[in-house]
């Protein structure tokens, strides 16, 4: 419903239905984690991944949503991308549809406030914005997060801290980490996407030619099974230099 929305108002109405489910999931996670740090990555996959591709499945979903088959089929077609790995996903979704980031922030902060009040635990939400390649992207989404989070925390009358960080998974992000660090309180290196974008091939498609690369001694092993020290590792090292004012560095494999 949210994906098929034609206006901001329709999208916000659909997101309002999703929010309680996200909040419930986050509350369950915070209860399990206690005061241990937990990082929540905001919506990353392209939207087409949430829709069916087979006609019979589209027909069934259209009936459930009260749409015609043709209308839903057109939505699916409109979301098609030639290279979805580098397409409309990650922070780009939040820039295009800031109401998504606002909803996720409400779910995260409300969950943290509720579980903190219920258990007495000091919970510090760590919110991670994915696929940032330009500091202004991060600032745009961070402004949405901070506005929503600060309003909820003030309304609750508590002094809950939270952090906003990002994934370093685009080569440009690694090269401009010093600038991005001005808006991020932590980094997590997304080694899967960073490897894909540095090598220039998709993990899903590489099997078609990697066998020949092994046979011809071009690669000794799958670049996705270990961190490439010479190329990808160099980008990580450049991004993690000592003069960054970053509180926490991590990796997502």
Q: Which ranges hold each PLM region?
A:
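Conserved alpha/beta-domain cores
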Residues: 1-253
């Amino acid at each position: 419903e949210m994906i098929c929305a034609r206006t901001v108002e329709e999208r916000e109405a659909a997101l309002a239905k999703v929010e309680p489910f996200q909040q419930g999931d986050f509350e369950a996670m915070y209860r399990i984690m206690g005061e241990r740090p937990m990082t929540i990555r905001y919506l990353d996959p392209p939207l087409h991944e949430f829709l069916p591709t087979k006609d019979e499945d589209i027909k069934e979903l259209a009936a459930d949503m009260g749409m015609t088959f043709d209308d839903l089929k057109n939505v699916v077609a409109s979301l098609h991308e030639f290279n979805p790995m580098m397409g409309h996903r990650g922070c780009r979704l939040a820039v295009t549809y800031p109401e998504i980031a606002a909803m996720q922030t409400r779910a995260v902060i409300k969950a943290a406030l509720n579980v903190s009040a219920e258990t007495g635990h000091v919970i510090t939400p760590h919110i991670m914005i994915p696929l940032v390649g330009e500091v202004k992207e991060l600032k745009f989404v961070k402004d949405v997060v901070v506005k929503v989070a600060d309003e909820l925390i003030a309304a609750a009358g508590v002094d809950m801290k939270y952090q906003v960080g990002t994934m370093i998974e685009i080569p440009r992000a690694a090269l401009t980490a010093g600038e991005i660090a001005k808006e991020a309180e932590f980094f997590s290196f997304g080694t899967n996407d960073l490897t894909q974008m540095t090598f220039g091939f998709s993990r899903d498609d590489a099997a078609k030619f990697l066998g020949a690369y092994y046979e011809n001694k071009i690669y000794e092993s799958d670049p996705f099974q270990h961190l490439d020290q010479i190329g990808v590792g160099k980008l990580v090292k450049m991004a993690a230099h000592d003069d960054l004012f970053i509180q926490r560095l991590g990796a997502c494999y």
